[in-house]
Curated annotation (Swiss-Prot):
<dbReference type="Pfam" id="PF02403">
    <property type="entry name" value="Seryl_tRNA_N"/>
</dbReference>
<keyword id="KW-0030">Aminoacyl-tRNA synthetase</keyword>
<dbReference type="GO" id="GO:0016740">
    <property type="term" value="F:transferase activity"/>
</dbReference>
<dbReference type="InterPro" id="IPR006195">
    <property type="entry name" value="aa-tRNA-synth_II"/>
</dbReference>
<comment type="function">
    <text>Catalyzes the attachment of serine to tRNA(Ser). Is also able to aminoacylate tRNA(Sec) with serine, to form the misacylated tRNA L-seryl-tRNA(Sec), which will be further converted into selenocysteinyl-tRNA(Sec).</text>
</comment>
<dbReference type="GO" id="GO:0005737">
    <property type="term" value="C:cytoplasm"/>
</dbReference>
<comment type="pathway">
    <text>Aminoacyl-tRNA biosynthesis; selenocysteinyl-tRNA(Sec) biosynthesis; L-seryl-tRNA(Sec) from L-serine and tRNA(Sec): step 1/1.</text>
</comment>
<dbReference type="Pfam" id="PF00587">
    <property type="entry name" value="tRNA-synt_2b"/>
</dbReference>
<dbReference type="InterPro" id="IPR045864">
    <property type="entry name" value="aa-tRNA-synth_II/BPL/LPL"/>
</dbReference>
<keyword id="KW-0648">Protein biosynthesis</keyword>
<keyword id="KW-0436">Ligase</keyword>
<dbReference type="InterPro" id="IPR033729">
    <property type="entry name" value="SerRS_core"/>
</dbReference>
<dbReference type="InterPro" id="IPR010978">
    <property type="entry name" value="tRNA-bd_arm"/>
</dbReference>
<dbReference type="InterPro" id="IPR002317">
    <property type="entry name" value="Ser-tRNA-ligase_type_1"/>
</dbReference>
<comment type="similarity">
    <text>Belongs to the class-II aminoacyl-tRNA synthetase family. Type-1 seryl-tRNA synthetase subfamily.</text>
</comment>
<dbReference type="GO" id="GO:0005524">
    <property type="term" value="F:ATP binding"/>
</dbReference>
<keyword id="KW-0963">Cytoplasm</keyword>
Length: 424
């Protein structure tokens, strides 16, 4: 959520920044008018309340003097009626302002590339060289079916489209990957957490999914509960409505969880395979940091995600997302895109973002600065470390052999009981 004070004092600069995220200037101008009206009403209310207090004191004095107070009582009643009417108008205006402030995206950092969509993202670096095959590489869904480790047909029968069963060494591979990821993040100082997989609406509001993106989630009917779209939600809300000690920052959390997404608006996209599912495992990283340290922490978090891909020897690239492609809550985002041979393309496998104080303001997560004792909003960061299903897809395709088998990356073999190859 944006700081209304910043919008007031730096309106033109904020409007210019948000325009790069597709926010119409007319929306901000309307918000500015409503906010000005609100402040005018507040002045009127305070003036009327002061007058009412004066009249009340005069009534008390008149009664002590045994004077007639009918006119003054009538005047006070009129003042009270005016205050009540203005308070009601103020409540309506506050609701409108809340609608504006809770649906406006975050202000992009100065270093974010300006652009309309993913075509304007900027590549930062690459690691590894895509393998040159001397045979036609198969897509991971064909490999998985041929190896008997991924079953989409029965997933569709039991649940529906975009669901599957992992079997045998496929299930073992999935488990090996997320255990490996959690262990690696633990070495970097992250505290492992097992979170609830169901959260309430306040939690979804805190991280920015609600109210704007309800259609992308799975809600439990007639309840206040939602299946988590990412462990970012429970991890970030862990400290909702709390004041942390500044000397304890930064704080690192990591968690593996299922993620549930309706994929509204994704009809026809990635209809086969592990890239876009309604339910998938993901290892998440979340940080709580002081404002002056948050961008250094973003670089570290991105490096933590890269570490996983490097140890799995999977070629990837890092891109800085443009203003038009960033997520709603992000001030800056790096995407890690892994090489998928059958698509001859890099595909997103991690997204690492600094939301600055955007989520902290919504969730009221603050810290007491040990330097001056003041209570301030901290910065929150989140990143995938990594999406597990997409990692399975990348391993199957990059490590496939001509006979249809798949070599298991060396880093995962201790987690696979020493198995080296998945064979048909």
């Amino acid at each position: 959520m944006l700081d209304i004070k910043r919008i007031r004092t730096d309106f033109e600069a904020v409007a210019e920044k948000l325009a790069t995220r597709g926010v119409d200037a007319a929306v901000l101008n309307e918000m500015k008018k409503i906010d000005a009206k609100r402040r005018n009403i507040l002045v009127k209310v305070e003036t009327l309340k002061a007058e009412r207090n004066t009249v009340s004191a005069e009534i008390a004095q008149a009664k002590r003097n045994k004077e007639n107070t009918d006119d003054k009582i009538a005047a006070m009643q009129n003042l009270s009626a005016e205050v009540k009417a203005l308070d009601a108008e103020l409540a309506e205006i506050d609701a409108k302002l809340t609608e504006f402030t809770t649906t406006l995206p975050n202000i992009p950092a100065d270093s974010v590339p300006v652009g309309a969509d993913e075509d304007d993202n900027v590549e930062v670096r690459r690691w590894g060289t895509p393998r040159e095959f001397d045979f036609e590489p198969k897509a991971h869904w064909d490999l998985g079916e041929d190896l008997g480790i991924l079953d989409w047909e029965r997933g569709g029968k039991v649940t529906g489209a975009r669901f599957l069963f992992y079997k045998g060494l496929g299930a073992r591979l999935e488990r090996a990957i997320y255990n490996f990821m959690l262990d690696e993040h633990g070495k970097e100082g992250y505290t492992e957490v097992i979170t609830p997989y169901i959260v309430n609406h306040d939690s979804m509001f805190g991280t920015g999914q609600y109210p704007k993106f309800k259609e992308d989630t799975f809600e439990l009917s007639d309840t206040n509960f939602v299946l988590i779209p990412t462990a970012e939600v429970p991890l970030t809300n862990y400290y909702r409505d709390e004041i942390l000690d500044g000397k304890d920052l930064p704080i690192y959390f990591t968690a593996m969880s299922p993620s549930f997404r309706s994929e509204a608006g994704s009809a026809g996209r990635d209809t086969r395979g592990l890239i876009r599912l309604h339910q998938f495992h993901k290892v998440e990283m979340v940080k709580f940091a002081k404002p002056e340290e948050s961008y250094e922490e973003l670089e570290k978090m991105t490096a933590n995600a890269e570490n996983i891909l490097q140890k799995l020897n999977l070629p990837y690239r890092v891109v800085a997302l443009s203003t038009g492609d960033m997520g709603f809550s992000a001030a800056k985002t790096y995407d890690l895109e892994v090489w998928i041979p059958a698509q001859n393309n890099y595909r997103e496998i991690s997204s690492c973002s600094n939301t600055e104080d955007f989520q902290a303001r919504r969730a009221q997560i603050r810290y007491r600065d040990e330097a001056d004792g003041k209570v301030k909003l901290l910065h929150t960061l989140n990143g995938s470390g990594l999406a597990v299903g997409r990692t399975v897809a990348a391993i199957l395709e990059n490590y496939q052999n001509e006979d249809g088998s798949v070599t298991i990356p060396e880093a995962l073999r201790p987690y696979m009981g020493g198995a080296e190859v998945i064979k048909p």
